[in-house]
From Swiss-Prot:
InterPro entries: Glyco_trans_2-like, Glycosyltransf_2, Nucleotide-diphossugar_trans. The lineage of its organism: Bacteria, Pseudomonadati, Pseudomonadota, Gammaproteobacteria, Enterobacterales. It holds the Pfam family Glycos_transf_2. Pathway: Bacterial outer membrane biogenesis; LPS O-antigen biosynthesis. Optimum pH is 7. This is UDP-Gal:alpha-D-GlcNAc-diphosphoundecaprenol beta-1,3-galactosyltransferase.
Amino acid sequence: MSDDTPKFSVLMAIYIKDSPLFLSEALQSIYKNTVAPDEVIIIRDGKVTSELNSVIDSWRRYLNIKDFTLEKNMGLGAALNFGLNQCMHDLVIRADSDDINRTNRFECILDFMTKNGDVHILSSWVEEFEFNPGDKGIIKKVPSRNSILKYSKNRSPFNHPAVAFKKCEIMRVGGYGNEYLYEDYALWLKSLANGCNGDNIQQVLVDMRFSKETAKRRGGIKYAISEIKAQYHFYRANYISYQDFIINIITRIFVRLLPTSFRGYIYKKVIRRFL
């Protein structure tokens, strides 16, 4: 990339239950990218362990880390909203604390955004893994620009671990909300409804950690109730139609309430393509 490469911020939120090893691997993947971020903003969502703090400190010599701590755990949406206000640059690239960015991720984003100045939200495909990247062979694809609006009526049109956006546009629509477990999906629907343009790079740029424990957490009564509340909010806000609302509730709640072992199998074989 040339000397006039746009500067950008990487935004990450962590909390007390995050793995120090996974966080270190995530930060290493940022460091190994072919284009370096101008800053890495890390928000502690409440107090975290000394091990997590040690990992952050160990990477300060390699990355321009600017870290902040919320007084108490406020949830991902609130942590990211706080982080957005700390980002110096309009181009913000999200990074999760347990995922691995491929070495060309930032370069691909910068190249795409430079050539497509009217795009405000951008993500890419992700490949799931459990222990080592590539060990599951499951790629979560998301559509290109022309299909995003239709796709968004039934599922998130962007892969949150792989997303980048223009801060000014996200702030214009009010940033992340407090939709428990669905902060990202709600933001995308709100942004699209308010004139933001989105697209997806049609290649894998992030290896996303997705273990059996992750599948277990994505089910049960609590998750099902959150699903109903989120879908009802989307309907009341006119992001989706009544028909979309009913279809989404029937298909999603059925999956959330399946027995854990069976849900994991169905999720792997079928549902992962749709939820």
